A protein has these predicted regions:
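Anionic ligand-binding catalytic core segments
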Residues: 1-36, 40-145
Length: 145
C-alpha cells in the first residue's frame, strides 16, 4: 500500500501517516478484520489518489495475537506495537514522531473506548465483554513507548 501511495497519492506524506495511525489503531483495538481489501483509495483526478476514510473495523475481545496483513511485506504477522515502531521508517516517519503517534492513539483509545461503546448503545455486561479488545499488554506498551 505504501509503495502505491508513493507513486499515486496526491499527498503521500499525509497518507503514510494516516495508514500508520490505522496500523496502530488496528493493533490497539484488536481489529480482527485487517486484510488488504479493507483499505481503499478515492480518485482525486489527474491520475492521483487519496487514502479513503477508514472502514470495516471490528474489535475482537478474544485478542488474536496475529494480524491478517503483515506490518511489512514478508514480515511477521504479530500484533505488536514494538514491530509497528520498528516499521516507522518504511512509512517515512521519524521514530520520535512515531512514538508520539503511538502514545496519543493509545491515550485516546484507553480514555474513550467505554464512552464510544455507550454512544452506540453498548453498555453493562456487553461493554465489559469487549474490554479485553481495548485494554491489553499492547495498550500498556503503547502508553509507555
Amino acid at each position: 500500500i505504501v509503495d502505491f501511495m508513493r507513486s499515486y497519492s496526491s499527498d503521500p506524506v499525509a497518507d503514510f501517516r494516516e495508514l500508520y495511525r490505522r496500523l496502530i489503531f488496528t493493533i490497539l483495538v484488536s481489529n480482527k478484520d485487517d486484510h488488504l481489501k479493507n483499505h481503499g483509495f478515492l480518485y482525486v483526478g489527474a491520475g492521483q489518489w487519496r487514502l479513503s476514510p477508514v472502514f470495516d473495523v471490528n474489535p475482537a475481545p478474544d485478542r488474536n495475537p496475529h494480524l491478517e496483513t503483515a506490518i511489512l511485506e514478508g514480515g511477521a504477522h504479530d500484533r505488536s506495537i514494538n514491530l509497528a515502531l520498528e516499521a516507522c521508517a518504511f512509512f517515512e516517519i521519524p521514530a520520535a514522531e512515531a512514538r508520539e503517534m503511538i502514545r496519543a492513539t493509545a491515550r485516546r483509545i484507553s480514555d474513550g473506548w467505554r464512552e464510544a461503546l455507550r454512544q452506540v448503545g453498548v453498555s453493562g455486561g456487553m461493554a465489559r465483554d469487549y474490554e479485553p479488545a481495548f485494554m491489553s499488554d499492547q495498550m500498556e506498551e503503547a502508553l509507555a513507548v
